[in-house]
A protein has these predicted regions:
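Protein kinase glycine-rich loop
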Residues: 56-63
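Catalytic-loop of the protein kinase fold
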Residues: 164, 168-184
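Conserved hydrophobic alpha-helix
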Residues: 156-159, 163-166, 294
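Glycine-rich ATP phosphate-binding loop
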Residues: 63-83
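Non-catalytic scaffold residues of the protein kinase domain
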Residues: 101-104, 168
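Cytosolic eukaryotic protein kinase-like domains
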Residues: 3-36, 42, 78-83, 89-96, ...
Length: 336
């Protein structure tokens, strides 16, 4: 009986490989014009044993996928198993594309012997995942130190800039949010999850497609027009900046189309102080102004991500001196 069961499993795995592998190859060729990073192929048996092992533990999950910790050939890996077809192909193709950049978790390989591709990443067991308040741990945990939050914003901005500028066809992430940011054991921020990402046609700056993303992080203009551009990511990143600054979930920052945030830096500082959080008023004012510019679609002056990343680097260099606040103008520029 065991022989026939194993034979049936292998037959099913072979059938899945032909179907899943064909779709994966089609997506890969369409995305990268024949140029991609080589990744390892894992077998059905390897994934099955790794995820059935008693030592296997679930790292994190959502309604669309589940993360597992598994051991293959004596080495620990993080295994991502999807439930949605298009999302799985998107994630494996684009994760392979950016795998050598330090701003993203490293994709080691995949398995095509399941109905949907199974992604195998480097071991993420030591990684921490930001919660919806931009912190780590339980929801009421203290905020991370301000310099750490600022560093996270900078590193995520650099990763998004890479997506927007490194390839002939711009990659739009479309699901930038706190919960899609991992921190490695050295505190380095890594942006994850390409399940909703789209790649713009070469030479095009936008496409029309069904809107998708996470409530609280989605630009209302994008919902109305269904036009996706790099500014779709800029808006979502602006919300992430506000989450990191204020420590409140993205879904609570906008209510009925209106901002639900402190109207100026003084209110923001007061709010943080009342919650027992340390503050750096000068850097925080510059950071708040930049975040609001990212979210200000109506002005027509939203900055590109490369500009945002550079400005955050400059904010990092501003002296931590609260007495300088009087030298910061209303538009966020430092005066002398």
């Amino acid at each position: 009986m065991e022989f026939w069961r194993r034979r049936k499993e292998k037959g099913k795995a072979r059938e899945c490989f032909l179907k899943t592998g064909s779709m994966f190859l089609k997506k890969l060729i369409a995305d990268c014009n024949g140029i991609s990073n080589p990744i390892r192929m894992f077998s059905f048996d390897q994934i099955s044993k790794a995820t059935d092992d008693p030592r296997c533990s679930i790292l994190d999950g959502s309604s669309d996928f589940t993360w597992y910790k598994g051991v293959i050939e004596g080495k620990p890996y993080s295994i991502k198993i999807y439930r949605m077809e298009e999302m799985a192909y998107n994630d494996v193709v684009l994760s392979a594309r950016v795998s050598n950049h330090s701003g993203f978790p490293k994709l080691i390989g995949c398995c095509l012997e399941y109905p949907l591709p199974v992604l195998v990443f480097e071991d993420l067991d030591d990684y921490k995942i930001l919660n919806e308040r931009g912190s780590v741990g339980c929801e009421d945990a203290p905020l991370l130190p301000w310099n750490v939050r600022l560093k996270i914003a900078k590193e995520v901005a650099i990763a998004i800039t890479y997506l927007h500028t490194a390839f002939p066809r711009i990659i739009i992430h479309r699901n930038i949010k706190a919960e899609n940011v991992f921190l490695d054991k050295n505190g380095k921020a890594k942006l994850t999850d390409f399940s909703l990402a789209v790649t713009l046609p070469e030479g095009k700056s936008w496409i029309e497609t069904k809107w998708s993303g996470t409530c609280g992080y989605i630009d209302s203009g994008y919902v109305l027009t269904v036009l996706v551009s790099e500014y779709t990511d800029v808006f979502s990143f602006g919300i992430l900046m506000l989450v990191l600054l204020i420590g409140r979930p993205g879904g609570l920052l906008i209510s009925d189309g209106r901002w639900n945030i402190p109207s100026n830096i003084s209110e923001c500082v007061k709010d943080l102080q009342e919650r027992g959080e340390p503050v750096e008023p000068v850097q925080m004012k510059l950071f708040l102004d930049l975040a609001l510019r990212c979210c200000d679609r109506s002005s027509g002056y939203q900055p590109k991500m490369i500009v945002v990343a550079k400005e955050i680097m400059l904010i990092e260099k501003v002296p931590l001196d609260s007495q300088m606040l009087e030298n910061v103008s209303e538009d966020g520029q430092i005066t002398h």
